[in-house]
Amino acid sequence: MNTVQKAIELILHKGLRKYKSKNSKAGLVSIANQEKFESKVLNGKKNKKGSIFITRKKEDLRAKFGTRGVVLSSEEAVLDHVGQASHWTPNVYNFGTYGQNGLRTIVGHTEKNLQQINCFVIDIDSKSFPMTAINDVALNAGFGVPTMILETTKGYQVYYVLDKAVYVSNNKNFIAIKSAKRISQNLREMFADSLPNVDLTCNHFGFFRMPSVQNIVMFFEENVYTFKELQEWSKRQDDNKGNEQFHNVIESPFAKNAPVEQPKQMDELWFKQVISCTNVSPKQTKAGRNNAIFTLSLACFQSQYAIKDTMDLMDQFNSNLEQPLEHTEVRGIVMSAYSGKYQAAHKDYIERLLQTYGMGQASAFRAPSVLWKKHKKQRKDRVRSHWHEWEADIITFLSMNSNNKPVLYFTQSELCEALNVPRSTLNTVLKKSTKIYKTVEGKGKTAKTGLSTLGMLIAFALKENGKRRESYLNYLQGLFPKTGNILEQAKTSNVMEEQETLYGILEGLPAG
């Protein structure tokens, strides 16, 4: 079984039939035995199988007549489409069918038709950092390394796979979906705190890149998560944010960045045009309902409008839509806009909304072009920061500048200047940190400090083969004992596909 097949079967959690009902390549005996098994009642419940959806190319997701694709109801059919399909729904639906217009328009990929939730996917539209930074962000946040990372045209998609599927029912008003959405949103925000262009508004259970031989850059088969542990982690994240929805954003400690001092966007013509629109389409990926509400909420944030009042305003806007969102989803979008990661609505997104719905252009737009972008707190505002905050900065700096090298070398002066950190603080951080690997070359003023992170070292080790790889990983397990499970999996993993030439033997690691 190859890596792609392992990944797909792991994600689907037996939510589809094993074999195709027609034209299967499997033997008759295998098909008969499998059908007998699938017809059994397990734990008092029917062994129900569902469907997923795929599209041949990205453009099919936003076709004028609806999403164009194929409905698949067996693992065999899914594997037949590997390399041919661009996107899929990794979470399984109860059924799928086609529209009546004869253009292979697919129908059924809605939340209330979800059968089971298999995984959470984070979409990052940037390659301005090495892939290892994703693992470093997760580890630095006290969370686990992803199950799988796919490389896309513009960036990466990060998969966190559940150890077993969470089944959806309409009991208690689809409570599993609500809980899963909070987990998904908190995962996105965790990465958005450190990495650029994390998509915070795309459908949590929609279409994502389908795994293929070409796009899998990391896969740890055993690195799966229980829904319960993710729920507990998500609740802690929500508790840390505080009960911000009842405070004015300027007074709330939840806001890390104050709104920009510009003319209020709520007073501009485009805001009045967008908020009056009722035909915002759910099928528009870049100018749909989520993006409209997010853009309007950011304008409210920039205008120093209280978050409670923004909630009411967006609820009213949503209710006026021809196809409104759920109230809980609107609330989540507003909270993301008020999270402090952004300062105002961005011109590009405003223009896209106006052009899509025929309202002209935002000619009176005044906001700076750098907005709708995460802004870190200025160092001058963090003079008395704790050592672990400096540690996070160093890890981010190393990850962003690694260029797939296992170790980066600096003099202490160079590092202090790059991070604007006092030398005494730097020494304290490097002494206390269990997440940064340090080695020193030379003596005195000419000495250079080599620094690395676990993500950088794992990526380097996985480039090697056989005993050399095992030797490196055993050494890393000694350096970072808490990550033993991940490193054990890495010893047999061969899916880190690197295009660059292998680097020389890492100083300080055994020669193997």
From Swiss-Prot:
For the keyword DNA-binding, the answer is yes
- Biological process GO annotation list? DNA replication
**Keyword entries, A-Z:** DNA replication, DNA-binding, Plasmid
- What are the protein's GO molecular function terms? DNA binding
The record's annotation in InterPro entries points to: PriCT_1 (IPR014820)
The record describes the protein's role as: Essential for replication. Binds specifically to a 60-bp region corresponding to the putative origin of replication of pXO2. Also binds nonspecifically to single-stranded DNA with lower affinity.
Protein's UniProt name: Replication initiation protein
The record lists the organism as: Bacillus anthracis
